[in-house]
UniProtKB/Swiss-Prot annotation:
<protein>
    <recommendedName>
        <fullName>Histidine--tRNA ligase</fullName>
        <ecNumber>6.1.1.21</ecNumber>
    </recommendedName>
</protein>
<comment type="subunit">
    <text>Homodimer.</text>
</comment>
<keyword id="KW-0436">Ligase</keyword>
<keyword id="KW-0648">Protein biosynthesis</keyword>
<dbReference type="GO" id="GO:0004821">
    <property type="term" value="F:histidine-tRNA ligase activity"/>
</dbReference>
<comment type="similarity">
    <text>Belongs to the class-II aminoacyl-tRNA synthetase family.</text>
</comment>
<dbReference type="InterPro" id="IPR033656">
    <property type="entry name" value="HisRS_anticodon"/>
</dbReference>
<keyword id="KW-0067">ATP-binding</keyword>
<dbReference type="InterPro" id="IPR041715">
    <property type="entry name" value="HisRS-like_core"/>
</dbReference>
<dbReference type="Pfam" id="PF13393">
    <property type="entry name" value="tRNA-synt_His"/>
</dbReference>
<dbReference type="InterPro" id="IPR036621">
    <property type="entry name" value="Anticodon-bd_dom_sf"/>
</dbReference>
<keyword id="KW-0963">Cytoplasm</keyword>
<dbReference type="GO" id="GO:0005737">
    <property type="term" value="C:cytoplasm"/>
</dbReference>
<dbReference type="InterPro" id="IPR004516">
    <property type="entry name" value="HisRS/HisZ"/>
</dbReference>
<dbReference type="InterPro" id="IPR015807">
    <property type="entry name" value="His-tRNA-ligase"/>
</dbReference>
<dbReference type="InterPro" id="IPR006195">
    <property type="entry name" value="aa-tRNA-synth_II"/>
</dbReference>
<keyword id="KW-0547">Nucleotide-binding</keyword>
Length: 422
């Protein structure tokens, strides 16, 4: 017997029992984003490797350890996208979307990182990204945060997430801060683990988000980034906080929040839950005003966020917010000569007259008991039953599968009855 082929570790199937909750989350995401007038963009999942090296930073964990990179038959180095912002910027530059104009874009799709798989962290994962180009004020930062807050309310998880904010300032301010931070860390080399020592020389601000409790203990005495911020960044952050206060959105300023990608500046933020253990970040974003120019475009202010769908789905499962619409509304049961075709025609008529109604026809024969069992397994609320008599008389038996009540009606009245039952 041939060996069974299995999915790649960290890359999971979404099965029919799981997909309704995914569809609910995706539907809510699309409704909320569309309510703000943003437009969808779709990019390839494979990009040239140097795009991510230039955008994310060559000394980040993503580029150094986590990317799926390979050579194609032409010898070009290609990478499965580990995040969406770089590809969105590339698409905007290449297609002239960012030339002296404002763009508000969103995308949804799979991303890939070679990490150790664990609950809430996978090698193929799905992200929703929202990106705004051409606006540099704190007002659009606030709108993005308000958008995410609206989504949490729609999903029913707003009481289970909290917002953390920070400003990491301009490039010059961060350079001055890095010098002070490295000087501080060099005084505590005996406490730093090997990963922190490596980061101290490549990307010292990443030491701030270490999970090592011994290092966390000394960071309380480390220089504070807020003391090195330029005046423009301070004013921008103050304006953002005022807008969030006016909107009634609660937040906590976390001076150690720096995000893991090099392209961020000024505003950074994360939405965090305590319900998922170590994988608590469900959404993160911030400003990246230099990235468009860094990738070959004109100087263009930009801000955005990304959220992981796996973690949102996992959070809703953890909170038992899994009540979703059934996959089948009506199940067509037929028995006798010529009844199957009559049932298929009636089902097609229902689909045309009631958009969104989900009608499943029984195929494969079998007695009524077998067909009703299939209807229950499909999760249908109502069964429509056609025998030879009903076909001849243009009637149909309508059975409510939730309470067993059954009535016989003219086929022309079945639409009205279904509206009552579903």
């Amino acid at each position: 017997m041939a060996k069974t082929i299995q999915a790649i570790r960290g890359m999971n199937d979404c099965l029919p029992t799981q997909s309704p909750l995914w569809q609910k989350v995706e539907g809510s995401v699309k409704r909320v984003i569309s309510a703000y007038g943003y437009n969808e963009v779709r990019m390839p999942i494979v990009e040239q490797t140097h795009l991510f090296k230039r955008a994310i930073g060559e000394v980040t964990d993503v580029v150094e350890k986590e990317m799926y990179t390979f050579e194609d038959r032409n010898g070009d180095s290609l990478t499965l996208r580990p995040e969406g912002t770089a590809g969105c910027v590339r698409a905007g530059i290449e297609n002239g979307l960012l030339y002296n104009q404002e763009q508000r874009l969103w995308y949804m799709g799979p991303m890939f990182r070679h990490e150790r798989p664990q609950k809430g962290r996978y090698r193929q994962f799905h992200q929703v990204g929202v990106e705004v180009f051409g606006l540099n004020g704190p007002d659009v930062d606030a709108e993005l945060i308000m958008m995410t807050a609206r989504l949490w309310r729609e999903l029913g998880i707003d009481q289970h997430v909290r917002l953390e904010l920070n400003s990491i300032g301009s490039l010059e301010a961060r350079a001055n801060y890095r010098t002070a931070l490295v000087a501080f860390l060099e005084q505590h080399l005996d406490v730093l683990d090997e990963d922190c020592k490596r980061r101290m020389h490549t990307n010292p601000m990443r030491v701030l988000d270490t999970k090592n409790p011994d290092v966390q203990a000394i960071l309380g005495d480390a220089p504070k980034l807020s003391e090195y911020l330029d005046d423009d960044s301070k004013a921008h952050f103050s304006g953002l906080c005022e807008l969030l206060d006016a909107a009634g959105i609660q937040y906590q300023v976390n001076e150690r929040l720096v995000r893991g990608l090099d392209y961020y500046n000024r505003t950074v933020f994360e939405w965090i839950t305590e319900s998922l253990g170590a994988q608590g970040t469900v959404c993160g974003g911030g400003r990246y005003d230099g990235l468009v120019e860094q990738l070959g475009g004109k100087t263009t202010p930009a801000v955005g966020f990304a959220m992981g769908l796996e973690r949102l789905v996992l959070l809703m499962e953890t909170l038992e917010l899994t009540d979703v619409r059934r996959s089948v509304d009506v199940y067509m049961v037929t028995a006798g000569e010529g009844t199957l075709m009559a049932g298929m025609k009636l089902a097609e008529s229902l689909r045309e007259q009631v958009p969104g109604l989900r009608v499943m026809c029984h195929f494969g024969g079998g007695n009524f008991k077998k067909q009703f069992k299939r209807a229950d397994n499909a999760g249908a609320a109502v069964a429509l039953i056609l025998g030879e008599t009903e076909v001849a008389e243009q009637t149909v038996n309508v059975k409510d599968l939730r309470n067993g009540e059954q009535v016989t009606l003219p086929q022309s009245d079945v639409f009205t009855k279904l509206a009552e039952l579903i």
